[in-house]
Each structure stands twice: as C-alpha cells, then as structure tokens.
A protein has these predicted regions:
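Short, Lys/Arg-enriched N-terminal segments with co-localized hydrophobic residues
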Residues: 1-5
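Beta1/beta-strand and adjacent pyrophosphate-binding region of the FAD-binding site
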Residues: 6-19
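Glycine-rich FAD pyrophosphate-binding loop
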Residues: 12-14, 26-49
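Conserved Rossmann-like nucleotide-cofactor binding loop
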Residues: 19, 43, 150
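N-terminal glycine-rich dinucleotide-binding loop that anchors FAD/FMN and/or NAD(P) in oxidoreductases
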Residues: 49-71
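Conserved N-terminal helical subregion
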Residues: 59, 63, 74-172
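Conserved FAD-binding catalytic core of PHBH/FMO-like flavoproteins
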Residues: 149-244
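FAD-binding beta-loop-beta segment adjacent to the flavin cofactor pocket
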Residues: 245-260
C-alpha cells in the first residue's frame, strides 16, 4: 500500500540557464520530487545567442512544456558544405533529409523567457541566492549544478587533475539580417577557419566563425563583414550582436560527487 505521507525527495537545481530551467521543469513533471531552482540574485542581460538542437531534443521540449509556439523553432532539412579555393567557394557536399528535420534553431532569450514563465505557472519554488559553498545546499537530498566551468562551487567537487588546451583561437558570433531566398544551414571551410551559418527565421541567421586569436589585432568588424559579403555574394545585409569568445578545452576526470 502506497504511503501517501511519504516525504518527497528534495532536489535543487543551481543555475537558471537553459539547462537549469529545462532540468527543473523535467524533474517537476515526475511529481514525486520537491524541486527548487536556485539562481543568482542579480539581473541578467539578454542571452543574444542561438542554439541548434536535434529532432529528439525538440520533441523533449514539447513533453516538458505544455504549449510551445512552433514558430520559435526554425527547422532544417538540409545542410550545405562549402570549401574555399583560391578564387571561389565550392559546394562539395549536401546533407538532405526528406522525412524529418535534421535540426532546429532557436533564439536563447525567447525560449528562456518561455521556460521562466512555465516555471512560474508550475509553481516551482525559485530561490534568488548566491551559492558560494556546497554547505549552502546541505538541506537537499540531491544537488544538480547547471553552472559554468568557472563557478567556485563547481570547481570544488571535480578532480583537480584535468586536460587543458588553449587552441589560440576565438569564436566570433553574431546575427545577420538578409533578403536572400532559400537560405540553408551551411558550413564553410574557409582558409581563416570554419564558418557555420544557422538560419533561425526567414530572413535572419546566426553565425559562428572560428579564427586565429591574432585576428583580434585587426579591425575585426570590417574583417567579418567583408568575409560574409564574399560568402553570401551580396552586401545587402545587416550584422548585429557581434561577440567573440576564446576557444579552450577543459576536460575533468569527474563531474559528480556523492549526491551532487
């Protein structure tokens, strides 16, 4: 006979990024857990990035969230691959999938807003608190950390030995508004580094370009603009939200500890 008075397991998710928000909603759906979401007590700037997910992850979104606007997810059935030669870029391979989509791309800030509203609707307890030490979480049966690698709490549970590598490269990201027709997801293997194009609406796409960090010494905005002009064969575009991040490898031996 089921004990209706059985105490629910208390679980906390630390971090309110996409992974933290989705984890909180997924665990709350089980019904047998007391789920708390803990996030830093400060205001975040908008996450002006895009994310590409597989078809199975797209289906998972619909299992976790009651109502989700399909227009927020831009589907892709085709991926074009290009190679830069001396005087042109050649389309050397295409991936096509007629029966299903290969991936979906969405804008992080729009989906994050929906997830936060869903958490409020489900009445998942949200705690605004800066977690500096693991002992701050002692009252929970399980702790799930959805934090960045630089988090002090995260660093305290992992093995000190790790594999680190500085690729001496940066990833340049941004949005492009255009009037081109039939813009597909694409990967360009350029001499300066690989450039990925991820459409997220009819006339917008995000890009990620991995290049040598020495290029930061140049006028990076002009450099990026001229290369995208060249790749798209048009100057009728608008580039916005351009940012850059260092590319580094950081592999740990362990990512868990007891109830964490």
């Amino acid at each position: 006979e089921k004990n209706l008075n059985m105490k629910k397991q208390r679980i906390c998710i630390v971090g309110d990024g996409l992974s933290g928000l989705m984890t909180a909603l997924a665990l709350n759906k089980l019904g047998s857990l007391e789920v708390h979401l803990i996030s830093r007590d400060n205001r975040h700037s908008k996450d002006k990035r895009t994310t590409a997910i597989s078809a199975s992850n797209y289906e998972f979104f619909y299992k976790v969230i009651d109502k989700l606007d399909k227009k927020l997810f831009w589907p892709s059935k085709k991926i074009d691959l290009f190679y830069e030669t001396k005087d042109q870029t050649m389309n050397f391979l295409n991936f096509n999938e007629d029966s299903k989509n290969l991936m979906y791309v969405f804008e992080n800030d729009k989906i994050k807003k929906i997830l936060i509203n869903e958490i409020k609707k489900k009445k998942i307890k949200t705690i605004k608190k800066n977690i500096n030490e693991l002992k701050d979480l002692d009252s929970y049966d399980m702790k799930i950390l959805c934090l960045g690698r630089s988090s002090k709490v995260y660093q305290s549970i992992i093995d000190k030995r790790s594999l680190n590598k500085d690729y001496k490269e940066i990833a340049i990201t941004g949005y492009v508004k255009h009037n081109l027709k039939n813009m597909n997801t694409a990967q360009y293997f350029l001499k300066d580094g690989p450039l990925a194009i991820l459409p997220f609406s009819k006339n917008k796409f995000s890009f990620v370009w991995s290049v040598d960090k020495e290029l930061l010494k140049k006028d990076i905005n002009s450099f990026v603009k001229s290369k995208i002009y060249e790749v798209l064969k048009t100057k009728k575009i608008q580039i916005s939200n351009q940012q850059s991040y260092p590319l580094m490898l950081n592999l740990k031996r362990t990512y868990y500890k007891n109830d964490i």
